[in-house]
Amino acid sequence: MSQYGLTVAQQFGTSLPEYSSVGEAERNLYRERDDALQEISLHLGETLRLDYSAESLKRLERWYFENGCPQNFNSGGAVAAAMGFYFGETLRRSAQFAWIVKEFAFAKGHYEIGVSRAPLPPVSM
């Protein structure tokens, strides 16, 4: 990685939430995920038939752009963050992904949440 890339990664890392342990990070970030999923379901679930299918992702994206890329729901929750969590949960439910929380490699004590494909089981021959 170039020096510039390292600097950018470190700056980004400091923008991530800071926790004293992975356990604390998991509790808080999973709660944030759950709250965002509840909020997107409450505001758009029925209207867009959000059922965690690939087609529902298309409906959600269309709604987002047709409504001028809204920043927040009326309740104040961030739309883009909720959409990201919805995408991750769709992957988890349909494509063998799992939620993970990990410390960011370039900023000690700062954590990120995301999804990762679960390893495939060994193939018997």
Regions found by a protein language model. Name each.
Residues 1-85, 90-94, 98-125:
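Intrinsic low-complexity, intrinsically disordered or marginally ordered coil/linker segments
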